């Protein structure tokens, strides 16, 4: 999965380590997601008061909204240990069993991309989540027998951008489902200002506003843009203000609405190549030379949230705003094509 320019892979140029250093440590430091944060604080306080493990938590929403950060804060606020892994890494049931048996009482186990767990591993999780127990099969053939191994109470925090891909039995075992939403520009501005202070970067409030307005409602992108704008500002020998930020973002091909070159290629393909749709995700992914997951998880959520694209039972359809963005007039029948249930 790739994005062009400043929205490229988060591991690039050491950004991942820097993002970790800038992460908030407590609920008080965590900006945004007010409803989710308020509810989680109540659940944490109640669990601490009962001296119990927090109920299992499912964090879902578009990438870059702070799911890993929230999981770490939950462990810190509970005063317990934190173990992290990801769905693709746990290939066998034995891998998960080894992790679970090494947890201390009430620890938090964070599984990123939990929708990518193999089915055999999911089945191990069911008794672990419900009964804090592992059902293991020892031996083979007629001599095989089942053994139940007790586990210490723990909290599973699962994170996913594709909650709909979770098996229903697994999804139903999460007592606390939390949907994370895109951030408001004002919230991103506060995040950018706080990060700039930690980095020792001179920045004006209007400079932070310029960056946050183009960050697609996503803190991870806002922090990445801050680093790139800082590079351009330092090369110019200037502080970050509205003018210097706008110049840098223009060079990065990120427009006033936060759309980058890949977004514009998507809209161009949908509107001009496929006449506004409807067109399937696989077809669009092939036209962009991107994986379908990248189209569905990275490109489309923001475009749909901004009103450029709609999903219909027949495929993706360009909204009138997409035509306007490309300087075209929407066909008369295009508006009616937008109505109907979302595509699965």
From Swiss-Prot:
Enzyme Commission designation: 3.6.4.-
Sorted UniProt keywords: ATP-binding, Cytoplasm, DNA damage, DNA recombination, DNA repair, DNA-binding, Hydrolase, Nucleotide-binding
Residues the record lists as binding Mg(2+): 68
This protein's GO CC annotations: cytoplasm; Holliday junction resolvase complex
Residues noted as binding ATP in the record, renumbered to the chain: 22-23, 64, 67-69, 130-132, 173, 183, 220
Amino acids binding DNA: 292, 311, 316
Annotated protein name in UniProt: Holliday junction branch migration complex subunit RuvB
Gene: ruvB
